[in-house]
């Protein structure tokens, strides 16, 4: 599932959803900009719809227009009655303000609602946030990524940089210690590539990606990049020699071949690569290439994942792993011959880049994707090994393995002396087996088994953060081991398993909080484990360290105030790039973690431009709260417009995603579409992380298993009813919207609510029947359709009669969505047609995938969402027969009496 974004910030902010090769340099911009450049109909000069008490209510954009036609009498009579109504309205308004103000003052908090904190420092003065700013990334923090690299002689703190203006050489390796303080030695680094343009056999190459060899004597270059799926791509690969500054094709016999993956050996003497779904080995001592496999093809993949493994299991382009000593290569063999195909049509573009045969120019291009839907055959995946010295491929049979049709391999980790740790789950992801394989003896055994279905009824998410801990008797580690994330008392925590076959770990962390993508790094010399966790709050992230025996847990970041941190460590964990991502304006710094005290060595980003914008724009105020529903404590943020007046009535928009393990309520700094709605349109925006979401423990997370949509919708509706009772909320103007899983949830809420609480909804790229979505994701949370037929039926959007009771809803889908297929929306619309349900609008974007970008679509869709929402809260959708908004009385008066226009 996509659109895994988060939402939060300080008083003025909310928030926006990598493995890094050395193509990204230290101090290189890494803006994570999800928006394409372009233009929008809104500008910074767009009139701000303020909500100050001194302004006339009729100027507010969300007030409904009249739904009755004005009489056809004389203009004078019209003006007279308009003035009478205005005077009467003013008297009534004064009375209402008095009563509501008193009510607001005397209101007591609901026992089910517990406010954590109110960020009250939002900027109320200044211009509103514009949609164009949001879509073009004007509010995105400037961020940098460091490509840490291990030194060939064990040096720590080395990093790769590209194209620094104050340093010579296109690509270089620097020691972070040479940059401490203000006196940076610009000549201290080692140049790997002198010039960006590389000449090879008379051809000029502009590398897209670069990967230095571990000994830093060679660089793997990639040019002619072509995107495949979310993480995968192809290109032409070259081996660049640092000493001579010359390059040659990775495979001299096929210089124009498109390579899908290439990886250096740890000993820097060979490259394993995949081309046309087969694996090859190029030893640098020879220009010839060795074929590791020969039968790869359309349905058989070696070393790279198919679509569903790339999307839902590995979240990477590689399923190939070198052993630490470079003697073996482990890789997956993926057979998807039994997986059914789904056709994705392109009506405008031709992504293949191929000209159609004569006579077929007017037919759409069709891409057939092997896409296993829930209940259909999965790809069969097996782990194979290649002995480099013997030039031999072999499997290792292990006892108690899952059957071929019930196996998902989620992680492969090399240990020492040819040993491998393999984690696998069953098809429904609720039984985990950990195997220890010895490639020298070609034997294996089961060393751990976790029956999660019986433990808490939940599931396990694929993760790839397990760390190998080599033996070091002189440092108190007599045996090899590894650190893994396990379930402990209902929360995700770090466990240290040693020796490798020991199923009983040393718990490094415990408590009612969770580690996140952990561990981040391990300092083997000092025996310290670094990790990020939610120890202070589910909405926060702080960096911690703990010793390998589980003692002396310490925070590296300031936990006395809300914070959302991320961190990347040098190879030896002696240095780190610390990124503060909110709630205030983000910053980044290099820190030294090698001593007992953490010291700041160099601040590399303060985002001064963003800090200036925060001071000059009218930003929403964010109120973070807890909501308790049916005994579950859930996280919520309410975004209030600038100049919020509790005596007024505001429309409310609920924005949600709510996919299993996801999070939208966090303390990141983000100015996004929700911020625009609150700042510019003057609406309140509420986001609730309902049951099923992540980082609040497994009780909250696993409650939705087998029945997606039911409890999440109940939580959203229950919370909306709480808000509808608030004195500052207009209960007649409440909407909900979401994208992807959020689109599914929007329809599920409208179905369950049946017009009682929400009048409007906007669903983008929604799943409408989980039998249409991919098997790996769906069955993890729903079991198979065979095992849970009633759950699938309950989760399907079927009660269209209930949706007809909403005032109106909007459906949007990309016509070439390869993730959530347009089949979902079309079959749902057929149900609407059968019962003559007409209270909806629909829009398709040609050739757009799940992100909806093709041909200006990304700007179009957000403008459409914004305008549709304005029309909804202005009452236009009440006029089903005539959806063109009529003039309000005030507009008629302004045209009749010029003085009123000013």
Curated annotation (Swiss-Prot):
Could you tell me which species this protein originates from? Aspergillus oryzae (strain ATCC 42149 / RIB 40) (Yellow koji mold)
Q: Which InterPro entries match?
A: AB_hydrolase_fold, Peptidase_S9_cat, Peptidase_S9B_N, Serine_Prot_S9B/DPPIV
Q: Which residues are glycosylated?
A: 335, 626, 794, 799
A molecular function annotated in GO for this UniProt entry is: serine-type peptidase activity
Q: Which residues form the active site?
A: 740, 817, 850
What is the protein's known function?
Type IV dipeptidyl-peptidase which removes N-terminal dipeptides sequentially from polypeptides having unsubstituted N-termini provided that the penultimate residue is proline.
Composition bias type Low complexity, residue spans: 7-21
Per UniProt, subcellular location reads as: Vacuole membrane
Reaction(s) catalyzed by this protein? Answer: Release of an N-terminal dipeptide, Xaa-Yaa-|-Zaa-, from a polypeptide, preferentially when Yaa is Pro, provided Zaa is neither Pro nor hydroxyproline
Q: What is its EC number?
A: 3.4.14.5
- Give the family from UniProt: Belongs to the peptidase S9B family.
Class of enzymatic activity (EC top level): hydrolase
Question: Which residues face the membrane's Cytoplasmic side?
Answer: 1-78
Recorded topology in the membrane: Single-pass type II membrane protein
Q: Please give the GO cellular component terms listed in this UniProt entry.
A: fungal-type vacuole membrane; plasma membrane
Q: Give an example GO biological process.
A: proteolysis
**Name of the protein:** Probable dipeptidyl-aminopeptidase B
């Amino acid at each position: 599932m996509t659109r895994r974004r988060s939402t939060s910030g300080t008083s003025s902010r909310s928030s926006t959803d990598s493995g890094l090769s050395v193509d990204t340099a230290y101090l290189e911009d890494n803006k994570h900009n999800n928006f394409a450049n372009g233009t929008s109909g809104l500008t910074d000069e767009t009139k701000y719809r303020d909500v100050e008490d001194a302004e006339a209510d009729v100027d507010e954009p969300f007030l409904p227009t009249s739904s009755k036609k004005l009489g056809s009498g004389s203009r004078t009579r019209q003006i007279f009655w308009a003035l009478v109504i205005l005077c009467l309205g003013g008297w009534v308004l004064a009375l209402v303000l008095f009563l509501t103000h008193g009510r607001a003052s005397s209101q007591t908090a609901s026992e089910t609602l517990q406010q954590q904190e109110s960020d009250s420092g939002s900027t109320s003065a200044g211009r509103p946030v514009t949609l164009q700013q949001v879509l073009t990334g004007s509010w995105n923090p400037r961020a940098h990524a460091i490509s840490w690299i291990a030194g060939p002689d064990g040096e720590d703190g080395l990093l790769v940089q590209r194209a620094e203006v104050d340093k010579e050489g296109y690509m270089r390796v620097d020691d972070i210690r040479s940059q401490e303080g203000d006196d940076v030695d610009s000549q201290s680094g080692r140049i790997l590539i002198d010039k960006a343009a590389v000449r090879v056999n008379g051809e000029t190459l502009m590398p897209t990606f670069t990967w230095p060899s571990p000994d830093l004597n060679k660089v793997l270059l990639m040019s002619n990049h072509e995107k495949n799926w979310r993480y995968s791509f192809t290109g032409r690969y070259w081996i660049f020699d640092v000493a001579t500054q010359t390059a040659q094709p990775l495979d001299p016999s096929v210089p124009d071949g498109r390579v899908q993956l290439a990886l250096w050996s740890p000993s820097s003497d060979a490259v394993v690569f995949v081309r046309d779904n087969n694996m090859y080995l190029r030893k640098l001592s020879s220009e010839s290439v060795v074929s590791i496999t020969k039968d790869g093809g359309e349905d058989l993949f070696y070393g790279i994942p198919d679509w569903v493994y790339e999307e839902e299991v590995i979240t990477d382009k590689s399923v190939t792993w070198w052993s630490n000593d470079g003697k073996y290569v482990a890789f997956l063999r993926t057979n998807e011959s039994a997986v059914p195909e789904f056709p994705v049509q392109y009506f405008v573009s031709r992504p293949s880049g191929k000209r159609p045969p004569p006579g077929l120019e007017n037919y759409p291009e069709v891409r057939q994707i092997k896409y296993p839907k829930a209940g259909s055959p999965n790809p069969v995946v097996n782990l194979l090994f290649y002995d480099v010295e013997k030039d031999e491929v072999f499997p290792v049979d292990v006892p108690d393995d899952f059957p071929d049709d019930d196996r998902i391999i989620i992680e492969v980790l090399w240990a020492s002396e040819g040993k491998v740790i393999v984690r696998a789950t069953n098809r429904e992801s609720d039984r985990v087996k950990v195997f220890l394989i010895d490639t020298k003896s070609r034997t294996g055994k089961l060393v751990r088994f976790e029956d999660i279905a019986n433990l808490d009824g939940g599931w396990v998410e694929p993760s790839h953060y397990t760390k190998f801990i080599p033996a070091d008797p002189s440092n108190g580690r007599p045996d090899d081991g590894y650190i893994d994330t396990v379930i402990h008392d209902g929360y995700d925590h770090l466990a240290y398993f040693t020796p490798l076959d020991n199923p009983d770990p040393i718990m490094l962390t415990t408590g009612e909080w969770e580690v996140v993508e952990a561990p981040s790094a391990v300092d083997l010399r000092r025996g310290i484990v670094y990790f990020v966790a939610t120890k202070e709050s589910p909405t926060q992230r702080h960096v911690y360290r703990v010793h390998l025996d589980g003692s002396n847990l310490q925070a590296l970041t300031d936990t006395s105030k809300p914070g959302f941190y991320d961190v990347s460590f040098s190879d030896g964990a002696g240095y780190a790039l610390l990124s503060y991502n909110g709630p205030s304006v983000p910053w980044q710094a290099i820190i030294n973690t090698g001593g007992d005290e953490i010291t700041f060595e160099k601040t590399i980003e303060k985002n001064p431009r963003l800090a200036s914008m925060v001071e000059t724009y009218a930003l929403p105020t964010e109120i973070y709260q807890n909501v308790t529903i049916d005994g579950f404590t859930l996280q919520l943020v309410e975004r209030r417009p600038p100049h919020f007046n509790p005596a007024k009535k505001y429309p409310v928009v609920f924005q949600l995603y709510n996919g299993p393990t996801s999070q939208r309520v966090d303390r990141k700094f983000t100015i996004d579409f929700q911020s625009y709605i609150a700042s510019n349109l003057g609406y309140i925006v509420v986001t609730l992380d309902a049951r099923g979401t992540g980082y609040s423990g497994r009780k909250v997370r696993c409650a939705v298993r087998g029945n997606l949509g039911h409890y999440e919708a109940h939580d959203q509706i229950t919370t909306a009813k709480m808000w509808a009772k608030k004195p500052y909320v207009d209960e007649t103007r409440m909407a909900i919207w979401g994208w992807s899983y959020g689109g599914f949830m929007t329809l599920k809420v409208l179905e369950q609510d049946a017009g009682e609480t929400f009048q409007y909804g906007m669903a983008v790229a929604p799943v409408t029947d989980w039998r249409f979505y991919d098997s790996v994701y769906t069955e993890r949370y729903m079991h198979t359709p065979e095992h849970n037929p009633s759950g699938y039926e309950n989760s399907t959007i079927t009660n269209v009669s209930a949706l007809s009771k909403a005032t109106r809803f909007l459906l949007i889908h990309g016509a070439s969505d390869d993730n959530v297929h347009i089949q979902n929306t079309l079959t749902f619309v057929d149900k609407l047609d059968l019962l003559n349900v007409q209270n909806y609008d629909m829009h398709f974007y040609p050739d757009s995938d799940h992100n909806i970008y093709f041909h200006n679509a990304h700007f179009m869709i957000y403008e459409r969402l914004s305008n549709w929402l304005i029309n909804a809260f202005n009452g236009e959708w009440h006029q089903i027969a005539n959806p063109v908004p009529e003039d309000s009385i005030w507009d008629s008066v302004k045209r009749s009496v010029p003085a009123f226009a000013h």
